[in-house]
Amino acid sequence: MGEKPEVLDAVLKETVDLENIPIEEVFENLRCTKEGLTATAAQERLSIFGYNKLEEKKESKFSKFLGFMWNPLSWVMEAAAIMAIALANGGGKPPDWQDFVGIITLLIINSTISFIEENNAGNAAAALMARLAPKAKVLRDGKWKEEDAAVLVPGDIISIKLGDIIPADARLLEGDPLKIDQSALTGESLPVTKGPGDGVYSGSTCKQGEIEAVVIATGVHTFFGKAAHLVDSTNQVGHFQKVLTAIGNFCICSIAVGMIIEIIVMYPIQHRKYRPGIDNLLVLLIGGIPIAMPTVLSVTMAIGSHRLAQQGAITKRMTAIEEMAGMDVLCSDKTGTLTLNKLTVDKYLIEVFARGVDADTVVLMAARASRTENQDAIDAAIVGMLADPKEARAGIREIHFLPFNPTDKRTALTYLDGEGKMHRVSKGAPEQILHLAHNKSDIERRVHAVIDKFAERGLRSLAVAYQEVPEGRKESAGGPWQFIALLPLFDPPRHDSAETIRRALNLGVNVKMITGDQLAIGKETGRRLGMGTNMYPSSALLGQTKDESISALPVDELIEKADGFAGVFPEHKYEIVKRLQARKHICGMTGDGVNDAPALKKADIGIAVDDATDAARSASDIVLTEPGLSVIISAVLTSRAIFQRMKNYTIYAVSITIRIVLGFMLLALIWQFDFPPFMVLIIAILNDGTIMTISKDRVKPSPLPDSWKLAEIFTTGVVLGGYLAMMTVIFFWAAYKTNFFPRVFGVSTLEKTATDDFRKLASAIYLQVSTISQALIFVTRSRSWSFMERPGLLLVVAFFIAQLVATLIAVYANWSFAAIEGIGWGWAGVIWLYNIVFYIPLDLXXFLIRYALSGKAWDLVIEQRIAFTRKKDFGKEQRELQWAHAQRTLHGLQVPDPKIFSETTNFNELNQLAEEAKRRAEIARLRELHTLKGHVESVVKLKGLDIETIQQAYTV
């Protein structure tokens, strides 16, 4: 039976509070039963409520295509096309249709390529995102089915079990209580218990239990969707668009200046005819505008986007690639990104209190007091320490298991051994277990001392106790409890995190840890990862009451130099990004929950990590499909390679604009040489076709964050373009005003004659301009000698094919409509030789420009000692000092000053040198943990043992 929209109107308009009314009224309002919906009813409700996902604005393909033809560069070309046919030719000649058709063809080709590449990249990203779409187990037509979570509707009955991400807002039905992790929504770090009748939110995670639920809200109507809706999808203009506009404006202004000079000289001074003057202006317009620039850059980014997707980073916003190349600060979540998000026990640090018990026995006892199925994180960590999880119940018979509850804060197992004797083991919060112990007063001080030592290292403590139950009944209180041991729990770093952070530092990316955990845990993770321990509680920096010890220093400076932040709330993430951006850093931010969305949106590069919620993915620029930090660093390298290609092209484009404008302007003004506009179109078409291949060029990624340096681009473009223009002017003078080439090479003369029509000279100038202009790309793509850096094969092949075509046109073409005449192979050879000879100084000019722009940069690099140093071997000297210090400390050659480790440093008196010394001493502990001897000494120091006595008895 079909649903009438008005029946569910109250639900759609949210005038009924489905979250708080009795569960029977929920079913009544939703017009559903515990047997679920039929497929037909679900489909009808889907048309009423919409899909269970966040809305995304989609642009029509046609308007997107037109967008590529609607920008300042295209406007200039469109104006040139109109000039070609609208302005009179004079003498009864028809309009220049060939120029008009050529310009329009060039525009359409560029727009089509841009559209196809960007559309393909978008489709690829959409397909990958679709693969990440969550699934849900739903009751339809009386059968349980696995469906995409997007098709859920209010009234559906769903099944929720351990590990599931709740697909929609729902009310729980009959069953055991669930443990729900709502941290992605509310920031609560601990799971909350939800029982029958309680509401659960879309985006939260089930950590324990299994139950059925009725869906009460989907899509934008969920708590999740409303929170995400608050994050404005602002279409702010990115760095890339600003740079593109700046380069385009520079080229347009250069052309405008050239045209104004031509108009002033040609008409009032030279008294040139109307139409030849217009043709000269068209040459500057057509040849000077880098019409292919948006296309080349779009194609380069689209191909780069495919490459990033293969590496596990889906690019939602293309221009994020350019911003990632310049990223110099990455704020990374600790849990799940830097660490495994999986608790483990360090067996070698277990502190045993009972006689005759070793660490393996302690682990076995703790495992017996753990669930073997439907485990929480601590149970999984303990049982995971066993060689085989079955050992937890091997040789015993379980009588009763006491699950964890907030009151007792412990678990316990009552069991019978092989001889039929009853025993009980318990694990839990140390205070609760200590309270059970019969000898509490004797061991209390030692227990607290060990807990404090663990806490200093950022380790959580778990206590284990044991008792015999002589009565043999599970209800019996049993004999005296014996306090067995304290186990240290820690979320270990990923195996590749330390190496990845080292690579990031070498690449000039400063990784800052963001964690909701306490400061000690953050510092211990920092030590193990080698990323520094200069960390602060975020509330001390950004809260209402600032820590007195750091109140004298600017918060922005502390945030900039910090290695991480502990106790972070979602609003702190946003503030951290905002302050880093205020200090001119390009900032990346990782996140996974709805509460991270504002910070992800604010960051220059928002990165949604693996398993992030839809809201985080929606707010982000890049979505990761693999866990860990290494995929981000790989994406940084790939982005820098992509950026290098784009930067190489923009320098080339500016150079060509200057060479065309200056070169042809001088020829027109000095010798009244009218170059055919159609031949400039041919140069543009061949050059643009070749230059497309730069998107797959072989490049070396920059070793440091790379950004658009407009001064460098414009200066290089003006110098190289000016040099090429003078090459053309000198060639024209030698060919037109002297007999140098006929005398030396025996070619026919192109000197001025009484009946000069410039046709052969136009062919010669065409070939000279075409070959050397396109060869310039090999100079702009190189950081050293261009012939020493091997370009991509595709670029080389495209260059030779294009220039073979250009040479054949110059040699054989007799095109009256284009006013050119073939010059033969002799002149073609002379022009190629001329260009090769004058090509070599281009590299020298590029070196001189870099040197001139560098100023005293190297002196600054050597003296700079902050975390954002531009040194290639970032931190090498500091790492060597850390290692030397660690070795001296390890072998007793030097006793470190305990003040170095003081947490209450007076920052007013702290100078830079002392701060560095403090950091070196703290990080040195990491080195101890990475050697066998160092690890032993670490344990010895932690436990306060006598190392000399041990060394006398054992060889370490």
Curated annotation (Swiss-Prot):
Cytoplasmic side: 1-65, 119-247, 301-647, 698-713, 781-792, 844-956
GO BP term, pick one: proton export across plasma membrane
Keyword set includes Cell membrane: yes
Extracellular side: 86-97, 269-278, 670-674, 735-759, 814-822
Keyword Zinc-finger: no
GO CC, one annotated term: plasma membrane
Membrane association type: Multi-pass membrane protein
SMART domains recorded: Cation_ATPase_N
The enzyme's E.C. designation: 7.1.2.1
Job of this protein: The plasma membrane ATPase of plants and fungi is a hydrogen ion pump. The proton gradient it generates drives the active transport of nutrients by H(+)-symport. The resulting external acidification and/or internal alkinization may mediate growth responses.
Name of protein: Plasma membrane ATPase 3
